[in-house]
Amino acid sequence: MVVIRLARGGAKKRPFYNIVAADSRNRRDGRFIERVGFYNPMAAESEKGLVVNAERLEYWKQHGAQLSPTVLRLAKQAAKAAA
């Protein structure tokens, strides 16, 4: 099953997350199918903190991908900011 979830990157105490479509059997930070966006909780005022490719997210949802609870919350947040 395909899951859209966060894959952690960045340094210690400086998290950075890629929003990825991955097989549910793969590790959190392991192999993924496609990068759909990113989330930077430590972003400065001048930087983008959340970017989501809504077209690709919708594509994966139509093909049966499940969104993790955090990605669902972030997708709603990104849609609200875009509107």
From Swiss-Prot:
Keywords: Ribonucleoprotein, Ribosomal protein. Signal peptide: none annotated. Pfam families: Ribosomal_S16. GO terms for molecular function: structural constituent of ribosome. GO terms for cellular component: cytoplasm; small ribosomal subunit. GO terms for biological process: translation. Belongs to the bacterial ribosomal protein bS16 family. PANTHER family: 30S RIBOSOMAL PROTEIN S16, SMALL RIBOSOMAL SUBUNIT PROTEIN BS16M. This is Small ribosomal subunit protein bS16.
